[in-house]
Amino acid sequence: MKASVFKSLYFQVLTAITLGVLLGHFYPELGAQMKPLGDGFVKLIKMIIAPVIFCTVVTGIAGMESMKAVGRTGAIALLYFEIVSTIALLIGLVIVNVVQPGAGMNIDPATLDAKAVALYAEQASQQGIIPFLLDIIPGSVVGAFASGNILQVLLFAVLFGFALHRLGEKGQLIFNVIESFSRVIFGIINMIMRLAPIGAFGAMAFTIGKYGVGSLVQLGQLIICFYITCVLFVVVVLGSIAKFNGFNIFKFIRYIKEELLIVLGTSSSESVLPRMLDKMEKAGCKKSVVGLVIPTGYSFNLDGTSIYLTMAAVFIAQATNTHMDVIHQVTLLVVLLLSSKGAAGVTGSGFIVLAATISAVGHLPLAGLALILGIDRFMSEARALTNLVGNGVATIVVAKWCNQLDNDQLQAVLSNKTLPNNEIKSSTSA
């Protein structure tokens, strides 16, 4: 039991952060020299931004069933995803502006590593909507991947996904190759995330050594602010949506409590995808709806990640005294409406998309990611839990709107009257 605790990434990161704080506090000069450890980890994350979003988007779109058969369901699902994700982004933006957890840190962006972000610094965005939209179109596909321009990669991925879907069986080989490549990419992410303790140690030691223990207070405020915001979003926003569609959000949370516990331990909503497919079908949602909404939602309906992205981006601006006027914040929202759709329900994806977003916006210092590197791991639980509840609610709502929901069965399982626990466990344990 003790060995498993020590091997836990959560424990390792927590220990690394503690050691980083102690080193930075008692030996500030030495702590400040640990900055390359955090910078190196950020560069590793940047390395796989483009391929992970390309694979996720392509397999998500190309893996859908017949467009004609599920056209209405897909359109309703995407409309729902866009509306609720936008609400999540706005809520995160409003609360971080009101609470201002990063105000007072007074971190000079010039002290952050410029070399670590040189690749993305070259992509400084031109002001104006027209240049911004034109810049989404790449000069070449290879150029989009080589430069790391995530919006260009995302555009190509969407077009590629639709084209691959139209090929049908003829494109199955290509689909299988990309899906296999996707597994390799996520395997790389898992390996990189094992280095998170080293990166967290370096980033935290540098932050405390350079700016003092007082900077840790603002980091704690960001974590608390984010968790409270996620709880409010689930209870108020998702709760209202659930009530409007005839079910209780708290009963639904109780229904998926086992899945929530798994996600809490893994920090990845993807870890319970097979279980969610099974449980949502047993909750009265037709299989065709469940098969479309749940997998698609893992890229297009990540409410917790949306809240995190706006809060983290503005926090970096506040901490580095980077002024963000209304135009800048609207631009941030527009970019996030696109880039957040490339996130995946795996640990670290939120941080990856945050890096992509900051690089695309161009106004914020990408090296500022080091400020939240040490605490990102501890916000991933709230992200994953909110994402999971959000996708479950979305499935029920879309099923109801498409007349593909057995409401009597839904009410029965939510009331714990006919919940087939044993069957669920046995069918999803493989």
UniProtKB/Swiss-Prot annotation:
GO terms for cellular component: plasma membrane. It is found in: Cell inner membrane. It is a multi-pass membrane protein. One of its GO terms (biological process) is L-aspartate transmembrane transport. Pfam families: SDF. It comes from the Bacteria. Its main location: membrane. SUPFAM superfamilies: Proton glutamate symport protein (SSF118215). PROSITE patterns: NA_DICARBOXYL_SYMP_1, NA_DICARBOXYL_SYMP_2. GO terms for molecular function: fumarate transmembrane transporter activity; malate:proton symporter activity; succinate transmembrane transporter activity. This is C4-dicarboxylate transport protein. It comes from Yersinia enterocolitica serotype O:8 / biotype 1B (strain NCTC 13174 / 8081). The gene is dctA.
